[in-house]
Amino acid sequence: MILCIDVGNSHIYGGVFDGDEIKLRFRHTSKVSTSDELGIFLKSVLRENNCSPETIRKIAICSVVPQVDYSLRSACVKYFSIDPFLLQAGVKTGLNIKYRNPVEVGADRIANAIAATHSFPNQNIIVIDFGTATTFCAISHKKAYLGGAILPGLRLSADALSKNTAKLPSVEIIKTESVVGRSTIESIQSGVYYGVLGACKELIQRIHHEAFNGDKILILATGGFASLFDKQGLYDHLVPDLVLQGIRLAAMMNTA
């Protein structure tokens, strides 16, 4: 079985795959941890879910937090006796990356693109990842990673208001029933939610025409906040495990 780990800015997400089927999912707050803390956590979460650590044959990591990489890699070696695969510049992806400097593309965005083109071949695709940042990736039917857009995520937007103003509070991120808030909290929640929704609609329209000349596209959504937009007609498919699927596929592509 393969243990796939996605190190994000807010959390570490993980999954255990048996073939192409995901058997286990977990999450851990991604504040910088020691290798021992990470190793103990990984072994514990496996055992708690009736998955023996000894059944893990490969570990694959995708990270956008460099300060966690060394500790996590050390944990894999010390606690699993496995040198993990790291999705990074120079590995096989099956994509033709059109960034001016391909090294700049986040590993999570590459993982999403790998999984998207594998699950939906020969299609023009926009992937929206609703995480700490909300990211857009445009991938052509020929597997060309054309580029995309990045904007603050919902939580980041709300936190920016509470941290940089004297009187605005921290709020829960929800889909509000009314656009017109009748309290400060409701107004922030409305502004954050519908502001991101509006930005997404505009970006989809512009990417559709600029990257794909108006040709048919498929829109995929993933990330922790994606389900909040499930009834807005924003995307065609919600794929919660997209990045983990991409990590697994990348690891298989790079297996000697």
UniProtKB/Swiss-Prot annotation:
Pfam families: Pan_kinase. A monovalent cation. Ammonium or potassium. Its cofactor is NH4(+); K(+). One of its GO terms (cellular component) is cytoplasm. It catalyses: (R)-pantothenate + ATP = (R)-4'-phosphopantothenate + ADP + H(+). The keyword Hydrolase does not apply. Transmembrane segments: none annotated. One of its GO terms (biological process) is coenzyme A biosynthetic process. The active site is at D108 (proton acceptor). GO terms for molecular function: ATP binding; metal ion binding; pantothenate kinase activity. ATP binds at D6, V7, G8, N9, S10, H11, I12, Y13, T132. Pathway: Cofactor biosynthesis; coenzyme A biosynthesis; CoA from (R)-pantothenate: step 1/5. The keyword Isomerase does not apply. Substrate binds at Y99, G106, A107, D108, R109, T184. Homodimer. Catalyzes the phosphorylation of pantothenate (Pan), the first step in CoA biosynthesis. This is Type III pantothenate kinase. It comes from Legionella pneumophila (strain Corby).
